[in-house]
Amino acid sequence: MELLLLSNSTLPGKAWLEHALPLIANQLNGRRSAVFIPFAGVTQTWDEYTDKTAEVLAPLGINVTGIHRVADPLAAIEKAEIVIVGGGNTFQLLKESRERGLLAPVADRVKRGALYIGWSAGANLACPTIRTTNDMPIVDPNGFDALDLFPLQINPHFTNALPEGHKGETREQHIRELLVVAPELTVIGLPEGNWIQVSNGQAVLGGPNTTWVFKAGEEAVALEAGHRF
């Protein structure tokens, strides 16, 4: 499988998806036709989200079609060489994808050679479940099971920092709560600016920041760019 799982879409001082464009270009391998799944968008319309994505990716020669715009979404997925899933609210993304019957077709198409690109919520959707999202559950997705394209759980936008005076839990504390009730999981704390690239059977960590791996009953392990999962 070919996957590009990004923690986030924007870095300080850079345009939207700017840091991801070289990564995407490097993994295209001649692919040009893409379907975009915009359902995580809540404060922007799906048309706006699709148009913005199409504009940014056009210089790479990628032709983007919004999955919500086509009469036959399953046929569009089958024809697509690239499946792109944008960030936003992971619960809405999963709900809409499940209700439209897209989960199994997307997973099958990616397993048969389509490139999967997802940032934030889109990275969460590639995991076995969405249980490591940071998002508010604004809708009920009727279960947390997701695409299961990547075998580990990703927590995007990972940071353990708290604002001064803040008395809430750290991100690690939230992850540790999950590992109490689901000790079989492995969670990747993927900070902003980092990504996981899967190609030719290898999953490789990229980005300038330390990534953390959390397992039940074990200390967190720090990983740097180049680590192979």
From Swiss-Prot:
**Record-level GO BP terms:** proteolysis
Per the Swiss-Prot or TrEMBL record, the active site comprises S120 (charge relay system), D135 (charge relay system), H157 (charge relay system)
Subcellular location field: Cytoplasm
Listed under GO cellular component are: cytoplasm
Give the keywords, sorted: Cytoplasm, Dipeptidase, Hydrolase, Protease, Serine protease
Protein's job: Hydrolyzes dipeptides containing N-terminal aspartate residues. May play a role in allowing the cell to use peptide aspartate to spare carbon otherwise required for the synthesis of the aspartate family of amino acids.
- The protein, known as: Peptidase E
Q: Which organism is it from?
A: Salmonella typhi
Gene name for this UniProt entry: pepE
